[in-house]
Structure formats: structure tokens, C-alpha cells
A protein has these predicted regions:
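Alpha-helical transmembrane segments and their immediate juxtamembrane cytosolic regions
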Residues: 1-318
Length: 318
């Protein structure tokens, strides 16, 4: 395959899709803030519903290499499903699988990379009732001040990369700087809650949103391309301009959220179909990583043009 062309189209699609995860978090904030009812009931309903499928599917993913060996398959099949799997999993060893499973409470493995979002989601659910108490009583001005402070933190990844690794009190013995309490995905929670009640006309939404999205996309795309053009780059440098909690990604996310608010589906059939899709969404997310590798291989095998391989593979996987 033409590696340079694959990298180009990966950047084109990857940059455009950066708002997806932030949008999910914003929707969570829009729907759940402020939290109603008892905190224990909220935790039981939300976290339990996520925790059990998360653990079961994490175990299945981590057992997969051992199962392929037990069934007599070549280690190559592991790379077919998980192209970035490390050398350790190629051993198809039960002890390696057990090691990965025991590590589930602490982090995801190379075989279940997409589970990073579930750790985040559980953390957000834990935080929501606590954050909600402030959101319920805070004035619009207070919420705006929080979002402003959060906005400043969106520039920190670039400061740390290009200027200095320490800022505002961070040092070798302190990772929690001055604006730490405002940083991270909790800003997206509040942003979703805040924008839910912001009523813009379609004209204003487009006039503001299109330039905002374009600027955010240009920074994301060309920043990523610049990093991948360097002769030597780390994983952190590779992901820098794709960082979800960065200003350029927020600039793409806000217009999409505001535009989505304007969508009014009147067809009852379509509304039911979307509702059913929503019900299945979490399960689809759990299992889809099994299909990404084979889907990409299939698109190449049947001669799908490189510019179309990513969207076609995505449709196959989901």
C-alpha cells in the first residue's frame, strides 16, 4: 500500500472526527446536569450499567490471543485483528492474558485500546453528582468564568510541548498546577450544559460555526501533518494536535453541537430507528474493535480506493 497516501487520508478523516468524543461528553453534560435524585441511586444506575459490560468485554479482548493459540491459529491472526499489538501478545500465552486481565482495574491493554473511553466515562459519572451541586447553584457569570479558565487550560498541551514542561506551580514533585481544577473533560460537561440553553438562530450558528470549525480543522490537520513529517516523534507528539482537550478541537466541537441542536426529525419511523440505534450503541462500541483490523484488510483486498478505505472500513466495523 501507498503509506504516504494512507497517512494523508488518515489525517484528513482523523482531524474531521476529533469532535466525536467531546460531543459524547457534552451530550452527557447537557442531559444529566444538574443531576436529579439520590447520588447512590445515580451511581447504581449509571456506573453499574457500564461496569459489567466493560469488564466482560475487556476480559474477552485480553483472552483473544490465547484463544487463537488454543484453536491452533497462527500468531499472524492477532496482527490481522489488532495491527498494533505488541510482541508479547504474539506468544498466545495464557499467563500474558491473565496479566492483562489483572491489570483491568488500572488501565486498558494494547488489545482493548478503545476502552480508554470507558475509564473516562466512569470517572465522569463519579464526578457528576459532586459537580452538579455547584452547577445547580452557580450563576451564568460563574459558569462563564469556569469555561474561561477551562479555555486557558486548552492551550497547555502546546505550552508543555513547545515552551516548557512546567507551568504555574507544576514541577517534579507536583503535577497539579494552578488551573488543574478547571482542566480536562469536566469542561466539556459544563460546556454541553451551558450551550444547551443557548439559543442561536440558524444564521448565527452558521455564520459563527463555519469559520470556527474551519480554523479548528486547519490547525488540527496541518499540526498533525507537521508532527508526522518530523524525522523522529514520540507518541505524545503524534497525538498533540489530536488532543481532545485542546482549543482547536473545541473550536470544531462547538459548531457541530450547536448545529445538531437545530436538527428536528419529524418522521416517527426515523426517530424510532435512531432510538433503537442509541440503545445498541454501547454494545456496538464494546465489540467494534474486533472488526476494525479485518475491515481494513478487506477494503484493501477488494481494491477499495485509498480515499474511501477509512469510511468503508468504519461502516463495516460498526
Amino acid at each position: 500500500p501507498n503509506i504516504e497516501e494512507i497517512k494523508l487520508w488518515g489525517a484528513i478523516y482523523g482531524a474531521a472526527l476529533r469532535p466525536c468524543v467531546p460531543l459524547f461528553v457534552m451530550i452527557t453534560g447537557a442531559l444529566l446536569l444538574p443531576v436529579r435524585g439520590d447520588t447512590s441511586a445515580f451511581y447504581k444506575k449509571r456506573i453499574t450499567r457500564v461496569l459489567y459490560p466493560f469488564f466482560i468485554w475487556s476480559v474477552i479482548y485480553n483472552l483473544f490471543p490465547w484463544i487463537t493459540g488454543w484453536l491452533g491459529f497462527s500468531p499472524q491472526i492477532i496482527l490481522d485483528f489488532f495491527p498494533y499489538a505488541g510482541e508479547e501478545v504474539m506468544r498466545q500465552s495464557f499467563s500474558v492474558a491473565v496479566k492483562y486481565i489483572l491489570n483491568i482495574p488500572f488501565n486498558f491493554s494494547i488489545l482493548a485500546v478503545h476502552m480508554w473511553y470507558i475509564y473516562l466515562l466512569i470517572g465522569l459519572y463519579l464526578y457528576l453528582p459532586i459537580f452538579s451541586a455547584w452547577v445547580e447553584k452557580a450563576s451564568e457569570r460563574a459558569k462563564q468564568m469556569f469555561l474561561l479558565a477551562w479555555g486557558v487550560t486548552l492551550l497547555l498541551p502546546y505550552y508543555y510541548q513547545f515552551v516548557d514542561g512546567y507551568l504555574w506551580g507544576t514541577c517534579s514533585w507536583n503535577s497539579f498546577g494552578m488551573l488543574y481544577a478547571f482542566a480536562g473533560f469536566n469542561g466539556y460537561l459544563l460546556l454541553g450544559h451551558y450551550l444547551k440553553n443557548l439559543d442561536w438562530s440558524m444564521k448565527k450558528t452558521l455564520a459563527t460555526g463555519i469559520p470556527m470549525f474551519v480554523i479548528g480543522y486547519v490547525v488540527t490537520f496541518f499540526g498533525f501533518r507537521h508532527m508526522t513529517a518530523l524525522p523522529d516523534y514520540t507518541d505524545e507528539m503524534l497525538e498533540l494536535f489530536f488532543t481532545y482537550c485542546s482549543l482547536n478541537v473545541v473550536m470544531m466541537t462547538i459548531p457541530v453541537f450547536m448545529l445538531a441542536k437545530k436538527v428536528n426529525i419529524r418522521s416517527e419511523r426515523i426517530r424510532k430507528a435512531l432510538a433503537n440505534l442509541t440503545v445498541c450503541g454501547f454494545g456496538v462500541y464494546m465489540i467494534h474493535y474486533f472488526f476494525t483490523g479485518p475491515a481494513v484488510m478487506l477494503t484493501r483486498a477488494i481494491g477499495i480506493p485509498i480515499p474511501l478505505q477509512i469510511p468503508v472500513a468504519a461502516v463495516m466495523a460498526f
